[in-house]
């Protein structure tokens, strides 16, 4: 899986943050997160690798077949975001698992790995809480949702039920309405037995991020990697 990689400022690296972009974006679009965290708290993130993978180029059905970076095809713009390519979703999950394994093979402990994402990437990040074969340090979902609950229930392995999750969502999001974020939280808590799911609403925030959310994200990651 190609993309942007930012090596730890001080080697050897002890932690890794993997962050997955949204539809139509690339890993470089979230590369600012590495600099933000390193400047905000140099001591906490000086031994941290940052990995921003690129999604494959897909013809997105709901966008008239336009070719763009996408973790999975969206078959139709429906209010529930349920009409997606489930096989593509699972394929991307497998790719993320391989990325995690690459970090583990380099000597990073699973508990020192964070998986995060925005929008489509957040949907995948949340799904890793069900499917990953290792217990990781934490999961970050910005403007996330759940598209294939039935399939994910079949794959749940219980390994990350105690892994902390931070889900930030704007109450003015026109792309992934806040109701879908709430449904995702309910699904992962009720059907997947996730025990530590923090859902925070940001007033006035649309389908984007804001400084307050980034501050909360940074605090969550620091706490998760130091616990």
Curated annotation (Swiss-Prot):
Subcellular compartments: Cytoplasm; Nucleus
InterPro entries recorded: AB_hydrolase_fold, LYPA1-2/EST-like, PLipase/COase/thioEstase
GO biological process: fatty acid metabolic process
Reaction(s) catalysed by this chain's protein: S-hexadecanoyl-L-cysteinyl-[protein] + H2O = L-cysteinyl-[protein] + hexadecanoate + H(+)
UniProtKB keywords: Cytoplasm, Fatty acid metabolism, Hydrolase, Lipid metabolism, Nucleus, Serine esterase
Listed EC numbers: 3.1.2.-, 3.1.2.22
Keyword Endoplasmic reticulum applies: no
Record SUPFAM superfamilies: alpha/beta-Hydrolases (SSF53474)
Active site, per annotation: 119 (charge relay system), 173 (charge relay system), 207 (charge relay system)
Broad EC category: hydrolase
Pfam families per the UniProt record, alphabetical: Abhydrolase_2
GO molecular-function term, one example from the UniProt record: palmitoyl-(protein) hydrolase activity
GO cellular component: cytoplasm; nucleus
Miscellaneous comment as given in the Swiss-Prot or TrEMBL entry: Present with 1480 molecules/cell in log phase SD medium.
Family: Belongs to the AB hydrolase superfamily. AB hydrolase 2 family.
Alphabetical list of PANTHER family matching this protein: LYSOPHOSPHOLIPASE-LIKE PROTEIN 1 (PTHR10655:SF17), LYSOPHOSPHOLIPASE-RELATED (PTHR10655)
Function comment: Hydrolyzes fatty acids from S-acylated cysteine residues in proteins with a strong preference for palmitoylated G-alpha proteins over other acyl substrates. Mediates the deacylation of G-alpha proteins such as GPA1 in vivo, but has weak or no activity toward palmitoylated Ras proteins. Has weak lysophospholipase activity in vitro; however such activity may not exist in vivo.
Listed name of the protein: Acyl-protein thioesterase 1
Organism: Saccharomyces cerevisiae (strain ATCC 204508 / S288c) (Baker's yeast)
């Amino acid at each position: 899986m190609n993309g942007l990689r930012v090596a730890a400022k001080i080697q050897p690296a002890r932690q890794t943050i993997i962050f997955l972009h949204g539809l139509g974006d690339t890993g470089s679009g979230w590369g600012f997160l590495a600099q933000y965290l390193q400047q905000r708290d140099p001591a906490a993130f000086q031994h941290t690798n940052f990995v921003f993978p690129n999604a494959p180029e897909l013809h997105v059905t709901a966008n008239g077949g336009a070719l763009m970076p996408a973790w999975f095809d969206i078959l139709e713009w429906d209010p529930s975001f349920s009409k997606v390519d489930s096989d593509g979703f699972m394929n991307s999950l497998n790719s993320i698992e391989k990325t995690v394994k690459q970090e583990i093979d380099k000597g990073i402990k699973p508990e020192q790995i964070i998986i995060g994402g925005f929008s489509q990437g957040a949907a995948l990040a949340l799904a890793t809480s069900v499917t990953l074969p290792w217990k990781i340090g934490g999961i970050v979902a910005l403007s996330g949702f759940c598209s294939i609950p039935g399939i994910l229930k079949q794959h749940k392995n219980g390994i990350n039920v105690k892994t902390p999750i931070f889900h930030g969502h704007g109450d003015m999001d026109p792309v992934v309405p806040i109701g879908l974020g709430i449904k995702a939280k309910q699904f992962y808590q009720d059907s997947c037995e996730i025990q530590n799911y923090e859902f925070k609403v940001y007033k006035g925030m649309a389908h984007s991020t804001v400084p307050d959310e980034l501050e909360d994200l940074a605090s969550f990651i620091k706490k998760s990697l130091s616990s």
